[in-house]
Amino acid sequence: PADFRKAKYQPKPELQYPDVYKQKPLKAIMHQRVGWYVSKGGILLATGNYGVALDRKDDPNDGNGIGRVVREVKKDGSLGPIYFIYYNHGFNEKNTAYPNYRKASKAVRAACEEILANPRYRMQWVEEADRGEKLIPVNNGYKAYCDYTLPDGRIASLWKHALTSLSLDGGNTYTTTNRALGFVNSNAKIWGQRLSDGTYATVYNPSEYRWPLGISLSGDGLEYKTLNLICGEVPPMRYGGNYKSRGPQYVRGIQEGNGVPKDS
């Protein structure tokens, strides 16, 4: 066994740089608000958008990227080929590194078609997609879309800054967007979903910063009556970079239609 008494403590620097900084110059940086999709046929797809950020003035989610790609995650954990499912302006199958999803297997093509037919899933592409993209139902600059279904079938939608809206037609159109009363939140994602007992929860940063992380509960998905702490710590920032914020933030759950795990 190792003798830890002889080990010398060597503190690591607070800021560490990932391997990407040691590689050759790259053409794109991955950005995604949504990373997974489970098809009706049981196909698991990983997805992300290739953005371009060459300088501090660039954002990987400014609508000026290359496009969104998908690849199958197989049951043994191996990965299938990469395919483009969406192209930003100026890009197509002829000037990109991977083929279009129409050249994938029948099962993967069907899964991609499900995504393209799902307005609630496409809404999560709004930041990376072209500005004014017709595929996006609400293309007005709001960020970090999230939604869940109410008992009466309406879709309750959430964005950053506690912006909320309702959809009466499954996500194709939405009511006027308003800021939720009493919902303290600034520039960070809010995640909301229906729980296994039929109640609802939102997980977010109830402050003007990206800490602490809290959870609020609701019986009907519209009126939230509790607020409890999940994490109040602000760990040191290990990696430097542009648009980095401290604190526990950008929580996601499992979106509707992608399965419901058993309660522990």
Language model features with spans:
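Asp-box/BNR beta-propeller blade signature and adjacent active/binding-site loops
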Residues: 1-264
